[in-house]
């Protein structure tokens, strides 16, 4: 027997749509925040890069000229050290600018969901470098993490690391992109097992401390070791006495450019400039999706009135996806134009023109529906 279900009441449909309405405002609010943050951050970085580039002077790596103190300098040469760095736990010794032992622990993690009236706590396991104490959890007894680790991360830097007569601080060494994995095949796993009290195995070029790498348990560890070996590097930085540091540009960003090998100062700046748009455009794409999603969710409220209002029916029925896409993109153009208005001249005008064109297209689509 087929039974006709009663039509959903207008009030019920309105109630069901309020959640989408709230979600739409959240999406648009988040999109607006990200647009202003992204455009301001991207412009600030580009401006800082331009300011830094205009001040750069090329200097030799030795001797250090005190007349250039606090100046932005470009230099290239061999980054060297006469000392060795040792990891006593793993019995590793290398001649390097930096030696980094990274230890990841498999542990319980807590996630708080505040979207509901009452906070809801989720627990899951994952790999992290920092050990999270279970005492910070709402339910510490059911999700116990180790109280301590038998071996922890260790970052070491050569104190005599230098580029010619310039002393290289850890910030510069960390910026060197060419870090290599240290071969762990000669590590005494039996000795490490005795020290840590955990079964040790070599998996790839990582040391696994635990019973089964394929089925990790809470408290298991993974150890990776990398080193920055002596090499030729190129730097744009601020000279501070006989050392180098990031330059704080008037626009607001700190600029420190380091590349492996002999790279010209123009190439250093160009490489940094090319990386910036990729990040900016990625965030822009996310913001466009948020705007379209937000508009689409807000349009659902019109579906409630679609049977009551002829105009809403025309807008929401056949071309809802197309309308929300055009409206969302136009809204993104408008918000981005407002965000860029204090920073640029031409781009806000162009974006505003696109926004107006989108609105005009929407009116034409409306009359055609």
Please place each PLM-identified region on the residue numbering.
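N-terminal Lys/Arg-rich, disordered targeting/topogenic segments
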Residues: 1-12, 369
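Alpha-helical transmembrane segments forming the membrane-embedded cores
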Residues: 6, 279, 283, 287, ...
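Cytosolic-side membrane-insertion boundary helix
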Residues: 10-13, 17, 254-292, 302, ...
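Hydrophobic alpha-helical transmembrane signal-anchor segments
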Residues: 12-40
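Alpha-helical transmembrane signal-anchor/signal-peptide segments
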Residues: 37-62
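Short, solvent-exposed beta-strand/turn "edge" segments of beta-rich domains on protein surfaces
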Residues: 62-73, 91-94
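OB-fold and OB-like beta-barrel modules that bind single-stranded nucleic acids
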Residues: 73-80, 310
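Soluble non-transmembrane domains of integral membrane proteins
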Residues: 78-247
């Amino acid at each position: 027997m087929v039974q006709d279900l009663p039509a959903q009441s207008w009030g019920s449909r309105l109630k069901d749509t309020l959640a989408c309405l709230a979600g739409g405002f959240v999406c648009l609010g988040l999109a607006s925040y990200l647009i202003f943050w992204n455009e301001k951050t991207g412009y600030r970085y580009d401006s800082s890069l331009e300011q830094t580039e205009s001040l750069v002077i090329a200097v030799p790596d030795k001797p250090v000229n005190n007349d250039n103190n606090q100046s932005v300098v470009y230099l290239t040469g061999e980054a060297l050290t006469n000392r060795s760095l040792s990891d006593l736990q793993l019995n590793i010794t290398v001649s390097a600018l930096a030696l980094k032992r990274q230890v990841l622990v498999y542990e319980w993690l807590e996630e708080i969901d505040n979207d509901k009236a009452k906070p809801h706590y989720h627990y899951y396991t994952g790999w992290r470098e920092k050990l999270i104490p279970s005492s910070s959890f709402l339910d510490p007894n059911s999700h116990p993490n180790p109280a301590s680790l038998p071996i922890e991360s260790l970052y070491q830097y050569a104190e005599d690391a230098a580029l010619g007569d310039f002393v290289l601080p850890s910030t510069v060494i960390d910026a060197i992109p060419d870090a290599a994995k240290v071969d762990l095949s000669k590590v005494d796993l039996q000795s490490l097992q005795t020290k840590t009290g955990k079964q040790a195995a070599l998996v790839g070029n990582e040391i696994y401390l635990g019973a089964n790498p394929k089925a990790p348990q809470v408290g298991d560890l993974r150890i990776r070791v990398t080193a920055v070996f002596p090499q030729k590097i190129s730097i744009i930085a601020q000279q501070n006495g006989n050392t180098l540091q990031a330059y704080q540009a008037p626009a607001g960003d700190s600029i420190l450019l380091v590349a492996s090998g002999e790279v010209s100062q123009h190439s250093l700046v160009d490489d940094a400039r090319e990386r910036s748009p990729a990040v900016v455009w990625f965030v822009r794409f996310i913001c466009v999706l948020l705007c379209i999603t937000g508009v689409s969710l807000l349009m659902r409220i019109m579906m409630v009135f679609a049977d009551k209002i002829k105009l809403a029916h025309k807008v929401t029925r056949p071309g809802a996806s197309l309308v929300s896409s055009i409206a969302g993109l136009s809204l993104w153009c408008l918000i981005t134009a407002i965000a860029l208005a204090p920073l640029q001249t031409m781009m806000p005008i162009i974006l505003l023109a696109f926004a107006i064109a989108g609105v005009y297209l929407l009116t034409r689509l409306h009359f055609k529906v």
